[in-house]
């Protein structure tokens, strides 16, 4: 969002945000945070990796402008490694907030939509958006896109 309105993405405060995200990356390459972080602020940015939270972190770091960061490679590897054979991702943890400390929401499509969006964003970012043609994008994520279509038709 900031880059789209002409903000300089190399500003110190933006780099600090990126660095914080990178400091929260788990050893498996993903990112996660549990709902307990609302009760215990020391848990912010900490928790088991989830596909949706990994995707959010990846898109944030990609927006900072350097496609060759180790954190990005590790996050992309996490998403590829944890994708199920049918193209879906499993997400056992709640990642949606209803009212913090009162109730939480499980948005079942978060685990499908956001990893696909993050992988497509990374691909366009790393290879250059001009090289992203519809046929190439379809070949990159065929299982996931089929799974999204199947899930939508089941709803």
Where are the regions a protein language model picked out?
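N-terminal charge/polar-biased segments
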Residues: 141, 154-155
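Short, intrinsically disordered C-terminal tails of secreted or membrane-associated proteins
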Residues: 150-151
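An alpha-helical repeat/solenoid feature that recognizes helix-turn-helix modules
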Residues: 1-129, 154
């Amino acid at each position: 969002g900031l880059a789209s309105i002409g903000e300089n993405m190399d500003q110190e405060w933006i780099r600090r945000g990126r660095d914080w995200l990178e400091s929260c990356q788990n050893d498996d390459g993903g990112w996660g945070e549990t709902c307990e972080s609302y009760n215990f602020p020391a848990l912010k940015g900490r928790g088991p990796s989830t596909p949706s939270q990994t995707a959010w972190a990846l898109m944030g770091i990609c927006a900072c402008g350097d496609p060759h960061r180790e954190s990005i490679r590790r996050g992309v590897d996490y998403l590829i490694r944890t994708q199920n054979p049918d193209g879906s991702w499993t997400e056992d943890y709640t990642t949606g907030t209803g009212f913090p400390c009162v109730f939480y929401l499980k948005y079942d499509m978060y685990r499908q939509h956001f990893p696909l969006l993050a992988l497509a964003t990374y691909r366009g970012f790393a290879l250059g958006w001009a090289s992203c043609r519809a046929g190439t994008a379809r070949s990159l994520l065929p299982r996931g896109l089929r799974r999204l279509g199947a899930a939508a038709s089941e709803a």
